[in-house]
């Protein structure tokens, strides 16, 4: 009897841990979504800025800088999208473990 209570308590602690971890991952995913959106806006801003800079301004270097900045922002968007995919996979695994805990009862 005592052993089953300990196991039941441990199962509850595991479930609470998984639930909190799942919520943490959801918050992190939402944060990454905001970062993706922000960086996509920056990409658009740089595209618009690039339209206003002309060659007769003799600032060809600015175009190179803007291109590099744009690439950096695009890379960030890709990195955040990859991270979101990893978080989503981890959330699915946690949901599966939580379902296993629930079915033990």
From Swiss-Prot:
It comes from the Bacteria. The keyword Cytoplasm applies. It is found in: Cytoplasm. The keyword Cytoplasm applies. Pfam families: DUF496. One of its GO terms (cellular component) is cytosol. Residues 70-104 form a coiled coil. Belongs to the pole-localizer TmaR family. NCBIfam families: PRK05423.1 (NF003844). Pole-localizer protein involved in the regulation of several cellular processes. This is Pole-localizer protein TmaR. It comes from Glaesserella parasuis serovar 5 (strain SH0165) (Haemophilus parasuis). The lineage of its organism: Bacteria, Pseudomonadati, Pseudomonadota, Gammaproteobacteria, Pasteurellales.
């Amino acid at each position: 009897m005592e052993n089953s209570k300990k196991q039941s308590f441990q199962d509850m602690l595991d479930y609470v841990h998984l639930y909190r971890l799942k919520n943490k991952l959801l918050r992190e995913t939402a944060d990454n979504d905001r970062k993706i959106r922000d960086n996509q806006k920056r990409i658009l801003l740089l595209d618009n800025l690039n339209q206003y800079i002309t060659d007769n301004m003799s600032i060809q270097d600015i175009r190179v800088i803007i291109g590099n900045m744009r690439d950096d922002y695009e890379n960030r968007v890709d990195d955040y999208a990859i991270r979101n995919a990893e978080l989503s996979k981890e959330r699915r695994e946690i949901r599966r473990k939580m379902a296993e805990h629930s079915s033990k009862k």
